[in-house]
Amino acid sequence: MVSRLEHPAGGYKKVFESCEELAEPIPAHVSGEIPAWLSGSLLRMGPGLFEVGDEPFYHLFDGQALLHKFDLKDGRVTYHRRFIRTDAYVRAMTEKRVVITEFGTTAYPDPCKNIFSRFFTYFQGIEVTDNCLVNIYPIGEDFYACTETNFITKVDPDTLETVKKVDLCNYLSVNGLTAHPHIEADGTVYNIGNCFGKNMSLAYNIVKIPPLQEDKSDQFEKSKILVQFPSSERFKPSYVHSFGITENHFVFVETPVKINLLKFLTSWSIRGSNYMDCFESNDKMGTWFHLAAKNPGKYIDHKFRTSAFNIFHHINCFEDQGFIVVDLCTWKGHEFVYNYLYLANLRQNWEEVKKAALRAPQPEVRRYVLPLDIHREEQGKNLVSLPYTTATAVMRSDGTVWLEPEVLFSGPRQAFEFPQINYSKFNGKDYTFAYGLGLNHFVPDRICKLNVKSKETWIWQEPDAYPSEPLFVQSPDAEDEDDGVLLSIVVKPGVSQRPAFLLILKATDLTEIARAEVDVLIPVTLHGIYKP
């Protein structure tokens, strides 16, 4: 995985261009042989509209939500896409301007209104976006597109039509939830979001949405708070993008990237700011690990500490001999990585992209080990006794346990990100293989496989080809953990070929099985699922 491609032609810029939705599915041109058992839909979310009228969106996470679908059946493939009819999208299309403030783009009052109307608009308070561009996941028999606010949007996975908007605040005490829930085999959904805890201080709630019952009753009505994690700072919650789960525990990593609540509450009504303006870094905090028992939900008051890093994606967590093993895609330091994901940065020429990446936090895949049985008299001793890892946990005199990781992969400005595993069989369990999107100075230019035990790596890459997060689909008669395929949408702009394709790789060694090319460019996608 140390090989590095150069991109002087700047073809990666194409994934940040707006596109039009499709009136109906279009056929793909298949080369290779798609496995007969691979019959289903690849659903992907991402930004598809990067400007409205004359007004641009500024950040990667601002573009309007576009739902993509590749249908696979009997060796044939079709591609379809539609914009989700969120309030943010519909109002923007109606008024031909940015109407609701997005992650890094501020919406301003209509310039056509008189001064008194504009003044009143500023003081109406916060209008939270429902632009659900990040992920899509099932709740019961339904599918919901999501971002990280309190709004999720039900969509039809067959027609891609927008069904309805759901406000999670009507059911749960959370200000928002992550776009990375954990879903168990019975359909139980777990997620995490910040909330107001005791004495009006901030906290983080693990929420549980039960599986669909025989009577088909509303699952949201039966959702509940399972356990609460305290916040290290009363009015500054950490940014949370994902969390970990094992058979018996939840793992929450609290990073030094903070949301300044005072800025957040005054941004829209007074200062005219956006979400990115409300982030700041606590350069003295480091990073804290929290644990909670799963059933019954109970916070475990062990004080795990380590040096500062950003974390967006957990790879996997599992329990072993009284320890919890936590594998993460980290970015070193306390500076917020999202500062480097403004579209102006991502669209720069190749040499400028490389210069920016030199200044950014550096990526590293790390393994941390958290002991469950801790005794104060063991000060100064490494509490980790697992024979297969060099990760350590040392009790300090102040009662904290200092963690040092084992590095599973590290390459200068080469990230292993958007990780996937054989989720249905190995989530929360001891595992061997992870799959990821390789970022070269933030440019996605390879698909990676990592053996977390041996640290062996495999890659797929082609010149001027820009893949997406690879999703693992297990073979129906699988005996081995990596017996299956990887699905990734690849953009390959140029005059000599069709500009995008669905790539199907053999998960064991990342050799190509087939590709399904389409005659339209496909903008960047973030996350998604495979629906059999």
Swiss-Prot record:
GO molecular function terms noted in the UniProt entry: all-trans-retinyl-ester hydrolase, 11-cis retinol forming activity; all-trans-retinyl-palmitate hydrolase, 11-cis retinol forming activity; beta-carotene 15,15'-dioxygenase activity; metal ion binding; retinol isomerase activity
Signal keyword on record: no
GO BP terms: retinal metabolic process; retinoid metabolic process; zeaxanthin biosynthetic process
Keyword Plastid: no
Cofactor: Fe(2+)
The protein's Enzyme Commission number: 3.1.1.64, 3.1.1.90, 5.3.3.22
Residues reported in the UniProt entry to bind Fe cation: 180, 241, 313, 527
Main subcellular location of this protein, as a coarse class: cytoplasm
Cellular location(s): Cytoplasm; Cell membrane
Tissues expressed in: Retinal Mueller cells. Detected in the inner retina near the ganglion cell layer, in a region where the Mueller end feet are located, and a weak signal is observed between the outer nuclear and ganglion cell layers (at protein level).
Cited Pfam families: RPE65
Topology within the bilayer: Lipid-anchor
GO cellular component: cytosol; endoplasmic reticulum membrane; membrane; plasma membrane
Catalytic activity: an all-trans-retinyl ester + H2O = 13-cis-retinol + a fatty acid + H(+); lutein = (3R,3'S)-zeaxanthin; an all-trans-retinyl ester + H2O = 11-cis-retinol + a fatty acid + H(+); all-trans-retinyl hexadecanoate + H2O = 11-cis-retinol + hexadecanoate + H(+)
Cofactor note: Binds 1 Fe(2+) ion per subunit.
Post-translational modification: Palmitoylated.
InterPro entries: Carotenoid_Oase
Covalently attached lipid (S-palmitoyl cysteine), positions: 112, 329
Keywords carried by this UniProt record: Cell membrane, Cytoplasm, Hydrolase, Iron, Isomerase, Lipoprotein, Membrane, Metal-binding, Palmitate
PANTHER family, alphabetized: ALL-TRANS-RETINYL ESTER 13-CIS ISOMEROHYDROLASE-RELATED, BETA-CAROTENE DIOXYGENASE
Family: Belongs to the carotenoid oxygenase family.
Role played: Catalyzes both 11-cis retinol and 13-cis retinol, 2 stereoisomeric forms of retinoic acid from all-trans-retinyl ester. Acts as an alternative isomerohydrolase in retinal Mueller cells by catalyzing formation of 11-cis retinol, to meet the high demand for the chromophore by cones. Capable of catalyzing the isomerization of lutein to meso-zeaxanthin an eye-specific carotenoid.
Protein's recorded name: Retinal Mueller cells isomerohydrolase
Organism: Danio rerio (Zebrafish)
